Amino acid sequence: MKIGLCAFSGYKIYPGHGKTMVKIDGKSFTFLDKKCERSYLMKRNPRKVTWTVLYRRKHRKGIEEEASKKRTRRTQKFQRAIVGASLAEILAKRNMKPEVRKAQRDQAIKVAKEQKRAVKAAKKAAAPAPAKKSAPKQKAAKVTQKAAPRVGGKR
């Protein structure tokens, strides 16, 4: 059993179906049905007609790709220096005993507090003692005029 292909749509044509058109120059075209034949004669581009095989191939429709295993990238540990501290310093601090680190930390805190106190004391000495507040001035009383007598009748 010979199965042909439609010249326009690309679908299979089984025996007993389809129509063959032969042009004057000898080229023969086999169409699945009248719809394909008319579309060809109207010079439609099968790549732009959504139901044709060529369109589906061009726009990658219905292609089931092999689901290859996705590789997950493992995070790699990497040690490097940080701004203000070299790698050697960081490693030295890490390898110190906790008691020594605690003592060092307490010492640093103590020094920082001392500096803070010194700055505060210097600021206090530099700023002159605030002058005594004088009694607030009393505002002058507003002079209000008497309302003019109403002239006129009852209404």
Curated annotation (Swiss-Prot):
A GO term from the CC aspect: cytosolic ribosome
Pfam families: Ribosomal_L24e (PF01246)
A GO MF label: mRNA binding
Keyword Lipid metabolism: no
Biased composition (Low complexity): 124-133
Any one of the GO BP annotations: cytoplasmic translation
Gene3D superfamilies in UniProt: 6.10.250.1270, Ribosomal protein L24e
Superkingdom classification of source: Eukaryota
Keyword Ribonucleoprotein: yes
Alphabetical keyword list: Ribonucleoprotein, Ribosomal protein
Disulfide bridges in this chain: none
Record SMART domains: TRASH
Ranges for region Disordered: 119-155
InterPro entries attached to this UniProt entry: L24e/L24_sf, Ribosomal_eL24, Ribosomal_eL24-rel_N, TRASH_dom
Similarity comment: family membership: Belongs to the eukaryotic ribosomal protein eL24 family.
Protein name as catalogued: Large ribosomal subunit protein eL24
Organism annotation: Drosophila melanogaster (Fruit fly)
